[in-house]
Design a protein with these regions (language model features):
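Hydrophobic alpha-helical transmembrane segments of multi-pass integral membrane proteins
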Residues: 1-370
């Protein structure tokens, strides 16, 4: 059914289009009555939310097969319903809308996505996947805090936690698969659970209105933990010229770096404003990880591996440069918008072309040989 053959096709296309469009509010502030609020809301709930849904729904059949189920994912009609919910959220959740209308619209997509994941996971008794299936509910928490309290720190910590939960499973899994290891997914190491717990505790402390120094201290602990968990990863393939894996690892590094910068800012160890420091976790982590994962859906297939094309690597490099520029120059926000928007426009073109070609199976990894 064209665009509806696989859930990642429409959701990735919408997400990349939104990533290119939303920052333009800094060049044309009249697009909305509150550019700051709309910008931070839509890059998290619109852009990252669509990308998250595209990945999780595409991974769902694999989860169900591992649990002994039939491995059937969401139907085309289900995908259409989620896309409609996403669009309603963008229309109803505008900065100028009343809070009740906005929150009702913004809640539709996270709730629909969570139900689309949780129900089949519960039916298949794939209990190990339940935390990730429930992860979209964090988007609902972010929407509530952004809308009712103008709380951008919850959004930043919430997105970091989502990447730690989801990315912290898929990045080492892709690395291990490239080594030819077929032993299956190993349990998450205790250190990784501890690192995720520290990040979740930082978010909880903030929600409980704890002093910034306590939130910052826990963010620093989480940064250390997210760095140390990499010692269990099979990093050799990423370090030996496998471009697709290198993108994932480089994207991941923004998580401990961003948490460290955030922690230093909250504890007063650095003088940069938080509005600048948080871009390491939004532009850096969120933008890089979304691209590194979604690009796998259109990368060229070689025996046992994916090949990252020059265009994908170039766009990834542009995202790194725009993030570093934003961090180095606090007032450089509007200046980096054209580069960011152009980069995501190119990614949207890749998504559009991919929707016209056969969907590769598996979507995000190479078929194993032999």
């Amino acid at each position: 059914m064209g665009l509806w053959r696989a859930p990642h096709l429409p959701l990735f296309l919408l997400g990349t289009f939104w990533a290119a469009l939303v920052p333009l509010v800094w060049l044309w502030p009249g697009l909305t009555c509150d550019p700051v609020a709309w910008h931070r809301q839509e890059l998290v709930l619109g852009f990252a939310g669509a990308a998250m849904g595209g990945y999780l729904l595409s991974a769902l059949p694999h989860w169900l097969k591992l649990a002994g189920g039939e491995g059937e994912g969401i139907s085309p009609r289900g995908t259409m319903a989620l896309v409609l919910a996403w669009v309603i959220g963008r229309l109803a959740g505008g900065a100028c809308q009343p809070d009740g209308v906005a929150l009702a619209g913004l809640a539709l997509y996270p709730l629909g996505l969570a139900l689309s994941l949780v129900l089949p996971v519960v039916r298949a008794k794939a209990w190990g996947r339940l935390p990730i299936a429930l992860a979209p509910l964090l988007l609902l928490l972010i929407a509530l805090r952004l809308r009712l309290a103008s709380d951008s720190l919850t959004a930043v910590l919430g997105m970091a936690l989502l990447v730690a939960l989801v990315g912290g499973r898929i990045v080492p899994a892709f690395l291990l698969a490239r080594t030819g290891d077929r032993s299956g997914r190993s349990p998450m190491p205790f250190g990784a659970r501890l690192a995720n717990g520290a990040l979740a505790l930082a978010l909880l402390l903030h929600l409980l209105n704890a002093a910034e120094v306590w939130v910052g201290g826990m963010a620093l602990a989480a940064a250390l933990g997210q760095t140390l968990r990499m010692k269990h990863w099979a990093l050799a393939p990423a370090l030996s010229g496998h471009g697709d894996l290198m993108l994932l690892v480089l994207a991941w590094l923004w998580l401990p770096l961003g948490l460290a910068l955030l922690g230093l800012g909250l504890t007063g160890a650095v003088a940069l404003p938080l509005s600048t420091l948080t871009h390491a976790l939004t532009m850096g982590l969120m933008g890089s990880m979304v691209l590194a994962v979604m690009a796998r859906a259109w990368m060229a297939r070689a025996p046992g591996r994916l090949v990252a094309g020059r265009a994908t690597i170039a766009v990834f490099a542009v995202l790194q440069l725009t993030t570093l520029s934003r961090l180095a120059l606090s007032e450089a926000g509007p200046a980096v918008v054209p580069a960011w928007a152009c980069a995501w426009t190119l990614v949207a073109q890749h998504c559009a072309r991919a929707s016209l070609r056969p969907v590769p199976r598996p979507v995000f990894s190479a078929r194993r040989g032999g």
